[in-house]
Amino acid sequence: VDILEEKTKDQDLEIELYKYMGPLKEQSKSTSAASTSDELSGSEGPSTESTSTGNQGEDKTTDNTYKEMEELEEAEGTSNLKKGLEFYKSSLKLDQLDKEKPKKKKSKRKKKRDSSSDRILLEESKTFTSENEL
């Protein structure tokens, strides 16, 4: 009796998984809602027959489910990666634009500062040489 209860629990969990996976499968394979309902009824059919064919059907569906989940994880990972790359590229462009604007202003200021610092250096060198001459 415990074995039958465990099998029904497994079947219920598998059905819930297919309900959850249904919309994701539709997006990736562009299938209609009718095909997912056919798949759900197909997965329920073999499991309600004898135990030997039910186990084989369950093994196949769990293998397929595992493969589908891996594919979805890979697909989601690549979409996140693409989003990350787009964000990185856009932030680089924004950083470059921000850096270009202040550079122009800073370069003008540096020239002014350089000329004033040159004057100061010249004056210091004159005072230093005049002090040394004394």
Curated annotation (Swiss-Prot):
Q: What pairs make up the disulfide bonds?
A: none
Q: Has UniProt tagged this entry with the keyword Cytoplasm?
A: no
Q: Where is there biased composition of kind Basic residues?
A: 102-113
List, as start-end ranges, the regions of compositional bias called Basic and acidic residues: 57-69, 114-126
The reply on keyword Nucleotidyltransferase is no
Report the transmembrane regions from the record.
Answer: none
Keywords, A to Z, come to: Malaria
Q: Quote the biased-composition stretches of kind Polar residues, using this chain's numbering.
A: 29-38
Query: What are the start and end residues of every segment in region (Disordered)?
Result: 21-82, 96-134
Low complexity bias spans = 39-54
Report which residue ranges the record marks as coiled coil.
none
What is the official name of this protein in its record?
Answer: Rhoptry antigen protein
Source organism of this protein record: Plasmodium falciparum
Q: What is the lineage of its organism?
A: Eukaryota, Sar, Alveolata, Apicomplexa, Aconoidasida
